[in-house]
C-alpha cells in the first residue's frame, strides 16, 4: 500500500488541472464583472499548485530552486488578481486605471525579480536544504527580509479585498450573499493556510497546502 505522502505531490498537480478548467470555464462568461481577473487568478493558482507539486516530488536541490522560480510567478500573481477581482466584483472597476494597475503590480514584479536573482543577494531566502519526510522531498529555507516585506504586501491587499467583499456582502440581498460568502471564506482559508505554513503549523510539517485551500471556493464561484 502506498504511503499517503507519495500521493501529496499528485494531489497538487490534480488541483492545478482543476484550476485550469475553472479558469477556462470562467473565461467563457466574459464580460461579467470580475470574470477576467478570476480567470487569471485560476491560471496563477494552477502555476503555483503544479510547480509546488513538482517541487516536493523532485529530489535535487538545484531542480527545486529552478522550479521555485516558476512557482513564484503564481505566488506573486494570485493576490494581485484577487484584489482586482474584488474591485471589479464590488462595482469599483473604474478605479483600475492603467496607472493604478501599474502601481499595484510594481511591488510583485520587483519581488519576482528578487526571487529570480536571489543567489546574488539572498534577500528572499537563504540556507536552502532538502528535508526528507517519508517519500516527500521538502525544500527548507530561511526567509529573508524581502520575503517578509512581500508577505506584508500580500496580506495587505488580500485583507483589503476581503474588506471590500464584506462591505458588499452587507449591502446585497440574501440571494446574492451566498456567492460572496464563498469568496470571503476562500480568502480566509487561503490566508490562514499561508500563515500556518510560514509559522510552522502545517498539517504535514513543511508542506504548504495554500494552493489547495482555495479550490473548493473557486469551484463554488465558477
Go through each PLM region and give its residues:
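Hydrophobic transmembrane alpha-helical segments in integral membrane proteins
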Residues: 1-18, 146-154
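Hydrophobic alpha-helical transmembrane segments of multi-pass membrane proteins
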Residues: 11-29, 36-59, 73-84, 104-122, ...
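Generic alpha-helical transmembrane segments
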Residues: 14-16, 75-79, 149-161, 188, ...
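Alpha-helical transmembrane segments in multipass membrane proteins, preferentially the mid-helix core
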Residues: 20-25, 81-88, 154-172, 221-222
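Membrane-interface helix-boundary motifs at transmembrane edges
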Residues: 25-37, 89-100, 167-179, 206
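Interfacial "cap-and-anchor" motif at the non-cytosolic start of specific transmembrane alpha-helices
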Residues: 39, 52-53, 151, 167-169, ...
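Non-cytosolic membrane-interface motifs at loop->transmembrane helix junctions
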Residues: 62-73, 204-214
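The cytoplasmic-loop to transmembrane-helix boundary for the fourth helix
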Residues: 90-147, 177-187
Amino acid at each position: 500500500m502506498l504511503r499517503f505522502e507519495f500521493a501529496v505531490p499528485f494531489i497538487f498537480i490534480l488541483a492545478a488541472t482543476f484550476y485550469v478548467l475553472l479558469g477556462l470555464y470562467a473565461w467563457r462568461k466574459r464580460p461579467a464583472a470580475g470574470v477576467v481577473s478570476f480567470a487569471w487568478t485560476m491560471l496563477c493558482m494552477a502555476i503555483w499548485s503544479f510547480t509546488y507539486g513538482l517541487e516536493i516530488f523532485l529530489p535535487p536541490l538545484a531542480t527545486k530552486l529552478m522550479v521555485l522560480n516558476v512557482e513564484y510567478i503564481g505566488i506573486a500573481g494570485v493576490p494581485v488578481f484577487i484584489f482586482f477581482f474584488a474591485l471589479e466584483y464590488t462595482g469599483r472597476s473604474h478605479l483600475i486605471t492603467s496607472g493604478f494597475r501599474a502601481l499595484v503590480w510594481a511591488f510583485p514584479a520587483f519581488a519576482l525579480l528578487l526571487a529570480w536573482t536571489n543567489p546574488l543577494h539572498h534577500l528572499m531566502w537563504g540556507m536552502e536544504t532538502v528535508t526528507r519526510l517519508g517519500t516527500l522531498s521538502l525544500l527548507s529555507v530561511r526567509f529573508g527580509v524581502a520575503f517578509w516585506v512581500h508577505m506584508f504586501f500580500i496580506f495587505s491587499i488580500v485583507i483589503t479585498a476581503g474588506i471590500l467583499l464584506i462591505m458588499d456582502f452587507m449591502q446585497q440581498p440574501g440571494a446574492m450573499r451566498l456567492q460572496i460568502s464563498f469568496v470571503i471564506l476562500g480568502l480566509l482559508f487561503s490566508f490562514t493556510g499561508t500563515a500556518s505554513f510560514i509559522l510552522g503549523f502545517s498539517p504535514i510539517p513543511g508542506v504548504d497546502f495554500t494552493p489547495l485551500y482555495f479550490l473548493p471556493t473557486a469551484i463554488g464561484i465558477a
